């Protein structure tokens, strides 16, 4: 039986409250579960009362093979119970293919414009030197 440590929604409409439960992966989100190991009240301000976890039972279930979901793993990482690996994707922030092509064209046009300006400045400076030497 594959186990997950996940959130089960409770509370009323527009007032969410979640139980952190150990459940079979095939069970419905708010359905049958094995044990409640904590709670999360997102309505409260960020403090110690917002997330309550039973660290001993969570470690027991992780040792039994239960896998925490991403959100629960964030809570466990904040509490120091489990380590959440960082997801590093350095290429995510880069512009797309078309945007990179546009940037390359703009850079090339800028280089050509600066080269023309340098040639014009050199041409303007050259006659003055020739006149001074004669």
UniProtKB/Swiss-Prot annotation:
Q: Where is this region: Disordered?
A: 79-134
Q: Which InterPro entries match?
A: Ribosomal_bS16 (IPR000307), Ribosomal_bS16_dom_sf (IPR023803)
Biased segments, Low complexity type: 115-134
Transmembrane stretches, start-end: none
User: Which Gene Ontology cellular-component terms appear in the entry?
Assistant: cytoplasm; small ribosomal subunit
Query: Could you give a GO molecular-function term held by this entry?
Result: structural constituent of ribosome
**Which keywords annotate this record?**
Ribonucleoprotein, Ribosomal protein
Could you confirm whether the keyword Ribonucleoprotein appears in this record?
yes
Output one GO BP term: translation
Under PANTHER family, the record lists: 30S RIBOSOMAL PROTEIN S16 (PTHR12919), SMALL RIBOSOMAL SUBUNIT PROTEIN BS16M (PTHR12919:SF20)
NCBIfam families per UniProt = S16 (TIGR00002)
Instruction: Say which family it is in.
Output: Belongs to the bacterial ribosomal protein bS16 family.
HAMAP family in alphabetical order: Ribosomal_bS16
Name recorded for this polypeptide: Small ribosomal subunit protein bS16
Source organism per UniProt: Brucella abortus (strain 2308)
Q: What is the lineage of its organism?
A: Bacteria, Pseudomonadati, Pseudomonadota, Alphaproteobacteria, Hyphomicrobiales
> What's the gene?
rpsP
């Amino acid at each position: 039986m594959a186990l997950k440590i996940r959130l089960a929604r409770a509370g009323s409409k527009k007032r969410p409250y979640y139980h952190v439960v150990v459940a079979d992966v095939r069970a419905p989100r708010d359905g049958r579960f094995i044990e409640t190991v904590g709670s999360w009240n997102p309505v409260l301000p960020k403090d110690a009362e917002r997330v309550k976890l039973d660290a001993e039972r969570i470690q027991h279930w992780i040792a039994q093979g239960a896998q925490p979901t991403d959100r629960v793993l964030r809570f466990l990482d904040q509490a120091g119970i489990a380590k959440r690996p960082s997801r590093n994707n350095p290429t995510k922030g880069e512009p797309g293919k078309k945007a990179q092509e546009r940037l390359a064209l703009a850079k090339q046009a800028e280089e050509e414009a600066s080269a023309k300006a340098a040639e014009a400045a050199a041409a303007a400076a050259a006659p003055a030197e020739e006149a001074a030497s004669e």
